[in-house]
Swiss-Prot record:
Name listed for the protein in its UniProt record: Chromosome partition protein MukF
Keyword Cell cycle: yes
A Pfam family per the record: KicB
Location of this chain's protein in the cell: Cytoplasm, Nucleoid
Keywords of the record: Calcium, Cell cycle, Cell division, Chromosome partition, Cytoplasm, DNA condensation
Repeat listed as a keyword: no
Gene Ontology annotations for the cellular component aspect, listed alphabetically: cytoplasm; nucleoid
Chain coiled-coil ranges: none
Reported function: Involved in chromosome condensation, segregation and cell cycle progression. May participate in facilitating chromosome segregation by condensation DNA from both sides of a centrally located replisome during cell division. Not required for mini-F plasmid partitioning. Probably acts via its interaction with MukB and MukE. Overexpression results in anucleate cells. It has a calcium binding activity.
UniProt-listed InterPro entries: MukF_M, MukF_M_sp, MukF_WHTH, WH-like_DNA-bd_sf, WH_DNA-bd_sf
Family affiliation: Belongs to the MukF family.
Record note on quaternary structure: Interacts, and probably forms a ternary complex, with MukE and MukB via its C-terminal region. The complex formation is stimulated by calcium or magnesium. It is required for an interaction between MukE and MukB.
GO biological process, one term: chromosome condensation
Length: 182
């Protein structure tokens, strides 16, 4: 755990004084994730406002929002992410009106967290399916061996009823969470 040199009241006062806030409704979070994906494709990590508007247009289309106001809503979303310190805006007097944007470490961390969660869910699902395959193979081998009622109950029935059924329930839950996230 981190050691903070400030007290709780000092940190609270500092956050209040600087007006720190994070608000990421689903649309804004999707926009941040889309920006992170675009950012990953750039060697220099720099994006133009036009790039961000194009990404927002895709998010807006996915959320089935009107296309007539997309430029203004994109501008509002960009300004919101800048205000929340998820994006940095760099302007130059030489290139007036052409700002360059970069994700901040906070923006990168938040997007990485959500992207990693999705990848973890996919990996977890793959592992669960592999375990089910092993359990089914073992139960099938035990069934081919034959044996008495105790053998069938212990090596075929019990693994299928408890182990495989439990894993299938877990797979179902993981898949539902992934579907909700998609």
């Amino acid at each position: 755990m981190s050691d903070f040199s400030q007290t709780v009241p000092e940190l609270v006062a500092w956050a209040r004084k600087n007006d720190f806030a994070l608000t990421l409704p689903t649309e804004r979070l999707a926009f941040l994730l889309a920006i992170a994906t675009l950012n990953g494709e750039r060697l220099d990590g720099e994006m133009s406002e036009g790039d961000l508007v194009d990404v927002f247009r895709h998010v807006s289309k996915t959320f089935e929002q009107t296309h007539e106001t997309v430029a203004q809503r994109a501008n509002n979303a960009i300004n919101d992410l800048v205000k929340q310190r998820l994006l940095n805006r760099f302007t130059s007097e030489l290139a007036e009106g052409n700002a360059i944007y970069r994700l901040t470490p906070l923006g990168i961390s938040i997007s990485d967290y959500y992207i990693r969660q999705r990848e973890f869910s996919t990996l977890r699902l793959s592992m669960q399916l592999s375990i089910v395959a092993q359990e089914l193979r073992a139960a099938g081998d035990a069934a081919e061996e034959g044996g008495d009622e105790f053998h069938w109950h212990r090596n075929v029935f019990a693994p299928l009823k408890y182990s495989v059924a439990e894993i299938f329930d877990s797979i179902d839950l993981t898949q539902r969470l992934m579907d909700e996230a998609a």
